[in-house]
């Protein structure tokens, strides 16, 4: 049996707080789908433009040759959007590094880093856990002397 040639694909993830987005990027026609539906239908609209930032920064011509399928889980609306945009940017950089050329990958990376570092680098901040003796992580219960 003849084996089929391997599809040119990369898989990258983005994280923000508890939200995780995994992007599967392969050669295609420029389609971007988020949880099975086109990215153009994402609600709320204000956050949709945040997702489109990598596309708007780099131009549609760089996304024309690739299809992206994104799975986003966890977190709230905003943190999920930040995870999605990070995974899109990281997937495109990885695809260009692996299947196109190093020069165009470097150009893409420079454009993204100049605009916003969080497009490629994860934010390590996490929620601090609650301790005893108070209602939250740092706040203490009120103390009475009389």
UniProtKB/Swiss-Prot annotation:
One of its GO terms (biological process) is translation. Keywords: Ribonucleoprotein, Ribosomal protein. Disulfide bonds: none annotated. Gene3D superfamilies: 3.30.230.10. The keyword Aminoacyl-tRNA synthetase does not apply. InterPro entries: Ribosomal_Su5_D2-typ_SF, Ribosomal_uS9, Ribsml_uS5_D2-typ_fold_subgr. One of its GO terms (molecular function) is structural constituent of ribosome. It holds the Pfam family Ribosomal_S9. GO terms for cellular component: cytosolic ribosome; cytosolic small ribosomal subunit; nucleolus. PANTHER family: RIBOSOMAL PROTEIN S16 (PTHR21569:SF16), RIBOSOMAL PROTEIN S9 (PTHR21569). Belongs to the universal ribosomal protein uS9 family. This is Small ribosomal subunit protein uS9y. The lineage of its organism: Eukaryota, Viridiplantae, Streptophyta, Embryophyta, Tracheophyta. The gene is RPS16B.
């Amino acid at each position: 049996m003849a084996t089929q040639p391997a599809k040119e694909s990369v898989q990258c993830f983005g994280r923000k707080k508890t939200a995780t987005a995994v992007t599967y990027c392969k050669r295609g026609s420029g389609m971007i789908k988020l949880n099975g539906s086109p990215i153009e239908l994402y609600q709320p609209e204000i956050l949709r433009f945040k997702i489109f930032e990598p596309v708007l920064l780099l131009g549609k011509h760089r996304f024309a040759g690739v299809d992206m399928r994104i799975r986003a889980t966890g977190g709230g609306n905003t943190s999920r959007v930040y995870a999605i945009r990070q995974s899109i940017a990281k997937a495109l950089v990885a695809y260009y590094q692996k299947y196109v050329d190093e020069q165009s990958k470097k150009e893409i990376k420079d454009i993204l880093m100049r605009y916003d570092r969080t497009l490629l680098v994860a934010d390590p901040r996490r929620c601090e856990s609650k301790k005893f003796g108070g209602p939250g992580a740092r706040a203490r219960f009120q103390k009475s002397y009389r």
